Amino acid sequence: MSIADESLSAMQAILSGMTSEQANRAPALPGANSPYAIGAHCVGMADYWGGSLIAGLRIPRDRDSEFRAQGDPQQLCVELGRIRRLIPGHAAIALTEGVRDRTTVGTTRNATDREASATWMLLHIVRELSQHLGQLEITRDILASADR
């Protein structure tokens, strides 16, 4: 899970260097998300797949609100750090016990994904974090370019 940790660490580095105004502004592009919303979605996604499904923790999730989320980027960095600390434990559960709770809801993916293997779920977390790190990097660069 070192790739997940690297992605989360890089997200923290980007967001910690932003003011609230910078973190909460989306590029002027259709459907674009703010850096804060991207990070909030990553927290929600990891809490859902790792915490709720794999670990059985039943963490409430409102996926749609993740993309409208606004707040202090420093506090979001704390949440990303929490996810960094939890992922190794979720991976251990996945590899030793499998998935503890397949009934939880909180994703737009189809219901059959909740029947996927624990390994698939871990790989999904890694893929999503890597994908959204790239999105965050591009978003940061677009916003910086617009400020010049």
Give residue spans per PLM region.
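Short, contiguous alpha-helical
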Residues: 1-15, 20-66, 104-148
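Acidic/histidine-rich alpha-helical segments that form the ligand environment
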Residues: 68-106, 117-125, 130
